[in-house]
Amino acid sequence: MNGIKYAVFTDKSIRLLGKNQYTFNVESGSTRTEIKHWVELFFDVKVIAMNSHRLPVKGRRVRPIMGHTMHYRRMIITLQPGYSIPPLRKKKT
């Protein structure tokens, strides 16, 4: 999976697991259709909606030069009812 970096586990993303929504950080150059294709192919699920946003960049100074560190987007992927991604499923307590 070229475009997907890793799954994100924040308070919000863990809360969204109950709504069958999964959060991933993806390469900034990847398109929405590529990400949808990779998720459906790799996890064998059906995607019904995708939301994406860019995170604010963090500054990084190396002597006199100021740069930034983040080069990715965050995608929130909603799956059809009945589908789930097993390693990321929330445990019921």
From Swiss-Prot:
Q: Kindly name one Pfam family recorded for this protein.
A: Ribosomal_L23
For the biological process aspect of GO, one term held by this record is: translation
Q: Write down the Gene3D superfamilies for this protein, in alphabetical order.
A: 3.30.70.330
Give the matching SUPFAM superfamilies.
Answer: Ribosomal proteins S24e, L23 and L15e (SSF54189)
User: Which UniProt key words apply to this protein?
Assistant: Chloroplast, Plastid, Ribonucleoprotein, Ribosomal protein, RNA-binding, rRNA-binding
| GO CC annotations, alphabetized | chloroplast; cytosolic large ribosomal subunit
**The keyword Ribonucleoprotein is annotated on this UniProt entry:** yes
The record's listing under InterPro entries reads:
Nucleotide-bd_a/b_plait_sf (IPR012677), Ribosomal_uL23-like (IPR013025), Ribosomal_uL23/eL15/eS24_sf (IPR012678), Ribosomal_uL23_CS (IPR001014)
PROSITE patterns, A to Z:
RIBOSOMAL_L23
**Molecular function as annotated in GO:** mRNA binding; rRNA binding; structural constituent of ribosome
Reported function:
Binds to 23S rRNA.
- Family (UniProt): Belongs to the universal ribosomal protein uL23 family.
> What do we know about how this protein assembles, alone or with others?
Part of the 50S ribosomal subunit.
- Can you name this protein? Large ribosomal subunit protein uL23cz/uL23cy
The species this protein was found in: Glycine max
